[in-house]
Amino acid sequence: MKETKNAEIRVPAEPYEFTFDPTRVALLCIDFQRDFVEAGGFGESLGNDVSTLRGAIAPTRKVLDCFREQDWMVIHTREGHREDLSDLFPSKRDRGNPTLRIGDIGPMGRLLTRGSKGHDIIPELYPIEGEVVLDKPGKGAFYGTDLETILRAGGITHLILTGVTTEVCVQSTAREANDRGFDCLILSDCTGSYFPEFYESALHMFKAQGGIVGWVGTSTDLLTAVDAAIPEIGESK
């Protein structure tokens, strides 16, 4: 980890500046899976236009590269279920398109099922050795996982959130994190929704009432703030 000029990195954000100690921050890449982001996956089976999510990939890659260069903690999540579906509630499987459900065969294998091609993370953001990959059975990344244990063990207090979709898995994770005392910065250009109105509403909810759930910023402002605190990043680009 490169030495910073100051103890804190200060990022312009809403409702006000987000500050973090670089030794206590982690990046969450939430559910950038083929099943949600690529054609032929679970998201498309529900009638969604998956192209609406792809705009979040490139800016997320820039943030991911920054965290990798600094050797800061990176955690990837994948929503999905065991092959025998023993961790899938009937109420969840029964929702959505009645002709194609979780566990059924799609173009990329069984939908939202661990071990299938669709369940895996997209190549553009694929984890490298040493990065945590959490398989979660629900929408929030804390439910049914050891995410909190990993964060506490690493001394993490602040989270940078990216991923899909804004109003479902990202929002659920942010709320769970907030209740556990973690400060969250959601990067608006590193997340996306199938529904533009849901995307906008979710971001407003995050930052409402003085940041009731967390802060909202952009990848550009985050990377600029890191560059200012750690000049070596900028010099190496």
Label for each model-derived stretch:
Residues 72-79, 187:
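Short beta-strand segments at enzyme active-site cores
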